[in-house]
From Swiss-Prot:
Active site annotation, chain numbering: S55
Gene name tied to this protein: pcm
Function recorded in the entry: Catalyzes the methyl esterification of L-isoaspartyl residues in peptides and proteins that result from spontaneous decomposition of normal L-aspartyl and L-asparaginyl residues. It plays a role in the repair and/or degradation of damaged proteins.
GO molecular function, a single term: protein-L-isoaspartate (D-aspartate) O-methyltransferase activity
Protein name: Protein-L-isoaspartate O-methyltransferase
Location(s), subcellular: Cytoplasm
Length: 209
């Protein structure tokens, strides 16, 4: 079924062969509950608990392709979620740092990605993804899997010169767009909105009191 999904995504316009091969090699059904496994290859988001979803395959493929990974990059992912996107990044990049704010999802991803799949190039943290992972920065690529009203300043600061960030931008109940932010070697940023999308909102830890 993964092979058929990759072939369908190719027909839908995904052109990066490495992205399609990674999708073909990874069983999406492992990242959803057993009662939803029959729907794992449908092109729609599926619930994963805690009010969160695994994104539809086309959007996952589009975002991954938009990163323009060549292999070897240091990647920050904000929103581990089910771990499916994380596992794809692990196949395509050098090293992946992924942050998840929901404790239950963070624990589940750790068990699946590190213990079951043994992904040695993946680092996981439970915390506020909008703050990034400062001690591991800078990152050549940043991927955000929840929508923020604007690009979080901490993530912008952690994007390396020559780097590329892909993220949904917009309010939770209004129009959202997928934005690609590129930082030139001179530090100057350019951005482009490339796809209308609908994502769950990026959540934050409450301030310390």
């Amino acid at each position: 079924m993964s092979t058929e999904l990759a072939a369908w995504l190719g027909h839908m316009g995904i052109r990066d062969r490495r992205v399609l091969d990674a999708i073909a090699a990874l069983d999406r059904a492992r990242f959803v509950s057993r009662d939803l496994s029959a729907e794992a290859y449908a092109d729609r988001p599926l619930p994963i608990g805690f009010g969160q979803t695994i994104s539809q395959p086309y959007v996952v493929a589009f975002m991954t392709e938009a990163l323009e990974l060549e292999g070897g990059e240091r990647v920050l992912e904000v929103g581990t979620g089910s771990g499916y996107q994380t596992a794809l990044l692990a196949r395509l990049a050098g090293e992946v740092w992924s942050v998840e704010i929901v404790p239950g999802l963070a624990a589940r991803a750790r068990a699946l990605l590190l213990e079951e799949l043994g992904l040695a190039n993946v680092h996981l943290r439970e915390g506020d993804g909008a703050l990034g992972w400062p001690e591991a920065a800078p990152f050549e690529r940043i991927l955000v899997t929840a929508a923020a009203p604007r690009v979080p300043p901490a993530l912008r600061a952690q994007l390396a010169p020559g780097g590329r960030m892909v993220l949904p931008v917009g309010e939770a109940e209004s129009e959202q767009v997928l934005r690609v932010v590129e930082r030139g070697a001179d530090g100057i940023e350019e951005s482009e909105d490339v796809l209308p999308v609908r994502f769950v909102p990026l959540t934050h830890l409450p301030p310390a009191v």
